[in-house]
A protein has these predicted regions:
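Juxtamembrane intracellular "pre-TM" segments in multi-pass secondary transporters
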Residues: 8-16, 195-228
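Conserved MFS/SLC helix-loop-helix module at the cytosolic interface between two early adjacent transmembrane helices
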Residues: 71-109
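Helix-to-loop junctions at the C-terminal end of transmembrane segments
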Residues: 73-84, 272-285, 369
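Structural signature of the two symmetry-related core transmembrane helices
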Residues: 87-101, 287-302, 382
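Helix-loop-helix hairpin linking two adjacent transmembrane segments in secondary transporters
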Residues: 111, 141, 148-195
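Intracellular juxtamembrane helix-capping segments at the cytosolic ends
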Residues: 125-137, 326-339
């Protein structure tokens, strides 16, 4: 069976445990849902002319999707501390299915941009699933469970691009959106049947709930600091994964298929998630954070060296992905421990900062590359995790 606990008591705030199969299913769901944000990234140049969007505005597709996701994190994810979680997951996933289907059908550039924003807005179910799993997992294994599920999220981010590139060769770009819509419908159906229920005990109006998100951000310095560290790291992650394919195709003779293989190799970095979970459970969160914040700028600087070939880009991809995932899970574990009854809102603050960083990174990537080329751009990208490292070392007493 997918789960041994299909229903959790409506006032359950105590962990009841998750089967290994359920953890694997949640990891798959996280990866599949978050992939919606990135399917368009490698194929925007195919989409834009067919819907009448200028090449100068093509990057808006990706940016609006990520900003929509950040908006959903801030305005929709906190509902998981107020409403029954399974119903929210099913509702948002079905809404994502509809918006993806409409995006595949539309021929209007303005409508496609609106739908891009809505795809991001409705793909927030992943950020309800993660704190739900944290609620259900026992304290002793919570880091491991969250780490395993977050590995699915990072794999979804990394594999969505090569998958999109491969699907577009067979089905065209509209087929990519139709396939994603069908997958969301299937996930909604399975979660409606198999996902454990959780009805929070927190009572408040929606306005008070959203206001409390900002109250939590003010109350917990650890939340602000962890959000800033990971936001800077994810901005560098987004910049790298936007810039590297351009560099590889322009100066290293890579084809779209080669870039897809490059992304697949980079996905090896997802092994950091379960490692991070075990480190957190063992009380080594600070050491793991230091390793992550050191690893990211060093990897980027090696890739920025004059004369560095594509091999260094591959190494950088693996190490950067490892560092980003390691720090994300360690930070998430620490943030969740601040207030067990507010995990969805804490997660909203944490993940909003991350994906705002990612959206800004993807927005400035192309202008940065066109003005400064690969080597100077890579140095600039390395400054972001270096700044996070400096902030971490200066506040050692807090985090």
């Amino acid at each position: 069976m997918l789960t041994g606990n299909p229903v959790v008591a409506t006032n359950a705030e105590q962990p009841v445990g998750l089967s290994g199969l359920m953890v694997a299913f949640l990891a798959f769901c996280c990866g599949a849902v978050v992939a919606n944000l990135y399917y368009a990234q490698p194929i925007v140049e195919l989409i834009a002319p067919q819907i009448g969007l200028s090449s100068a505005n093509a990057s808006l597709i990706v940016s609006l999707t990520q900003f929509g996701y950040a908006l959903g994190l801030l305005l929709l994810v906190p509902l998981a501390d107020l409403m029954e979680n399974r119903r929210l997951v099913v509702g948002f996933t079905l809404a994502a299915s509809v918006t993806l289907l409409c995006a595949g059908l539309t021929h209007s550039p303005s409508m496609f941009l609106v739908l891009s924003l809505l795809i991001g807005l409705t793909s927030v179910a992943v950020q309800i699933l993660v704190p739900l799993a944290a609620h259900l997992a026992p304290e002793a294994s919570r880091g491991r469970v969250v780490g395993n599920i977050m590995s699915g999220l990072l794999l979804g981010i990394l594999l969505s691009r090569p998958l999109s590139s491969l699907l577009v060769e067979v089905f065209g770009w509209r087929g990519v959106f139709y396939s994603a819509a069908a997958l969301m419908a299937v996930i909604a159906l399975i979660t409606a049947v198999a996902l454990p229920r959780r009805l929070p005990t927190h009572k408040a109006t929606y306005a008070a709930l959203i206001g409390s998100v900002f109250t939590l951000a003010r109350r917990y310095p650890v939340l602000r600091q962890r959000s800033l560290y990971q936001g800077l790291l994810f901005a560098s992650f987004s910049l790298f994964w936007t810039l590297a394919p351009i560099e590889l195709m322009r100066h290293h003779g890579f084809t779209q298929t080669h870039v897809a293989i490059f992304a697949l190799v980079g996905a090896v970095g997802a092994i950091a998630a379960p490692i991070a979970g075990r480190l957190a459970d063992a009380g080594h969160g600070r050491r793991g954070t230091l390793v992550a914040l050191l690893l990211a700028p060093v990897a980027l600087l090696f890739a920025a060296l004059p004369g560095s070939g594509y091999v260094w880009l591959v190494v950088c991809a693996v190490l950067l992905d490892f560092a980003v995932q390691l720090n994300m899970v360690l930070g998430q574990r620490e943030v969740y421990a601040l207030d067990p009854h507010s995990r969805a809102r804490l997660n909203a603050v944490y993940m909003t900062s991350i994906f705002v960083g990612g959206a800004v990174g993807s927005l400035v990537a192309s202008p940065l590359y066109e003005h400064f080329g690969w080597h100077l751009s890579a140095v600039a990208v390395a400054l972001l995790p270096a700044l996070a490292l400096g902030l971490f070392l200066s506040r050692r007493a807090d985090v």
